[in-house]
Amino acid sequence: MRKLLIGVALGALIVVVSACGGSSGSSASEEAMQRQSDLYEISQIERGFHEAISKKDIDKLVSLFAPNATGTFGPGKTVAGREQIRQVWLNSLGWKLETHWLSDHPAYKLKVTVDGDRGTLHFECHFIDIDTGKVAALTAGNLDVARIDGRWLITNFLGSTAELKI
């Protein structure tokens, strides 16, 4: 009887210890998987951004920004909120009817970081004039992003010029 009690006690102890040890491994892998998922979702902002600009889809473009996002589009040209961001894009050269640009990007220059519910995104934009086949403009975007209500959105956009190095 004594051996049976010791055996049951040891068995219970093994079950408890193995259950505790197993949870830390799965949570570490879950964290790694969540991080990879977040990096992917943030990188999709760049894809949506360039697609919206190429198609001149202002609603899609503005939907990538948080409601209270800020955008700096040049020295002294900082705006806040989706409506002001919308107006900057609608008044830009790329949105004019006579402008036929395709927004391309060198994927290898894409940089994404994530830290919990916040992250950063950097990309270049190469605007190709469809009529001439030549590069019409080079720009870059440095973005702060945040997960808001389960969706990654741009909270701060800093546009700049980029140098094309071949």
Provide a role label for each language-model segment:
Residues M1-L4:
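Positively charged n-region of N-terminal signal peptides that target proteins for export
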Residues G7-V17:
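Bacterial N-terminal signal peptides
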Residues C20-L64:
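Short, low-complexity N-terminal intrinsically disordered segments enriched in polar/charged residues
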Residues S27, L138-I166:
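Short beta-strand edge/turn micro-motifs at domain boundaries
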Residues F49, L61-V62, A69, G81, ...:
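Hydrophobic pocket/interface hotspot
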Residues F65, P75, F123-F127, L143, ...:
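A mature extracytoplasmic/lumenal domain signature
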Residues T70-A80, W95-E98:
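A short gly/proline-enriched turn/hairpin at secondary-structure junctions
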Residues Q84-G133:
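Surface-exposed, charged secondary-structure patches
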